[in-house]
């Protein structure tokens, strides 16, 4: 009988880190949503989860400093690496020409910088 792995990740259900966990862990898993990177680490340190999934680096925006800080401040260490493709969507009513301002997470805005600049959209980090 195999033991179900519990994996903590930062974000809501459907987050890229949850998707990475589901894609890369074999067998049945349970994913646990956390509101901060620190909480992700605390879940694994406190044995609520077996593993933590943290975004460490992005090919466009570089390192994710908050993840490094959380990991460095813990007793945990990296045991693997996952490459996970990120694809963003701009969703709304109307056409692209109707859009004036895009509100999103700073990482997402940075990852979509070329697209946003091509359309001259204003951006607001949230």
Predicted segments — roles?
Residues 1-126:
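Domain-level signature for soluble enzymes in the chorismate/prephenate branch of the shikimate pathway
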